[in-house]
Amino acid sequence: MLTATAQPATKTVRLKVIETSDVHGHFFPYDFMEKKPIKGTLVRANSYINKQRAKYGDNLLLIDNGDILQGQPCVYWSNYVMPEDENLAATVINYMKYDAETVGNHDIEPGHKVYDKWIREVRCPVLGANIVKEEYKNGEAAPDHIYTNLKPYSVHYKDGVKICVIGMLTPAIPNWLNKSIWKGIEFEEMVSCAKKWVKYIQDNEKPDLIFGLFHSGLNGGIKTDEYEEDGTESVAREVPGFDIIFFGHDHQVHNEWITNKEGKKVLCIDPSCYVKNVAEAEIELTYKNGHLVKKDIKGKIVSVLDEEIDQQMLNHFQPTIDKIKTYVNRRIGRFEHPIYTRESFFGNSAFTDLVHNLQMRISKAEISFNAPLAFNTIIKAGDVTQGDMFKLYRFENLMFVLRMTGEEVRKHLEFSYDMWVNTMTSPDDHALRLNDASKDDQQRTGFQYYTFNFDSAAGIDYSSFF
């Protein structure tokens, strides 16, 4: 006797997710500071993305992880010189058809007027689950608690697959930026924030996949009793529910699996900065009778340094590029002698003298603090242009005048020098605190600590006592 039995209906769905992070204005294959072509950038990344769109169709998800509003003169020009036009970063995001965007610390730093407008102009969801209206800090998971025009998460449907993306920003903003820049906002600690939003999403959305999109490094950075600057690893370990965490902020490449407290492995991937790479995840989902029974996830870092230029995109933005070149080539002064930022790391330098003198002249302060923000930049003798100033300060800085005691000044300088200068115990020791492992780190350039903390002072008369 033969009987017919129904075989379970099996369906396989293949998806690809591509992440960019810490773009810092690297939209076009041209360095507006050095005035020369460069590799990578979004114009090259878009060529790769278009190839993947041709392969995956609507099953491709494109996400960006913030820090897009500072870094190259083109974004400064858009933020402050041409503020009435649509923000250039928003225009580029919209042109490339991103599906989701997060906010980075360098997107907060330009100030309310810039980032509020940028958020409104971006057409895809801009995410910030831990960026809340100040009256709701550490409250329940509620979409109306999130800062104006931001969303805690986005929802995407790809071939029947429901995906939720939770966005978060490093909560260390108060360590760097004056409250006036983020008035009305609070930044929640990442682990507790992730826990409440994962539960909210699981209860209310019931997705097939949950991704994190975190502008926060893997680990390390600033740690206080209230928060961790680089909290991605902590979230991956302590908050079950994530399938993949796409992250950034630390300007380092990561592609690793972290085991959470339930024993499940979570892919954590970071493409680093300046669109030299993209991070991607290939996902294969297997369904039987409508039920998800298997997830296969693979992470990969893809270099786009030598990818072909998307000529159509370049042509589209060429009129804007020409206007920016006119701006950065504008003459603003003249140097009789060249200045080198490298000298600032080893002693007196014309660069630090320039900044110290300007700060004391403008502020009328008695003492100036200044740290070099570029390791090996040169401004040649001769005409100085607007673009040259970005060589000294890639990310625009604000000047603050503080009232300090002599003891506070001493402690501040000791704190700086302790990170900068090594205590030699043998002739073989380095005079400076060096670290070979950080040679490729954009913010440490071979030093043990971040060079933006290497403050020197001007205006102090020193005396020696023996």
Question: Over which residues does each language-model region extend?
Answer:
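Acidic, metal/ion-coordinating pockets
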Residues: 6-306, 346-358, 368
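Feature captures C-terminal
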Residues: 13-16, 26, 34-36, 40-44, ...
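Short, charged/polar low-complexity linear motifs in solvent-exposed/disordered segments
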Residues: 181-183, 287, 312, 419-420, ...
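Alpha-helix initiation and N-capping motif
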Residues: 42, 86, 111-112, 207, ...
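C-terminal segment of classical bacterial N-terminal signal peptides
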Residues: 1-5
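Hard-cation-handling environments
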Residues: 292, 296-391, 419-424
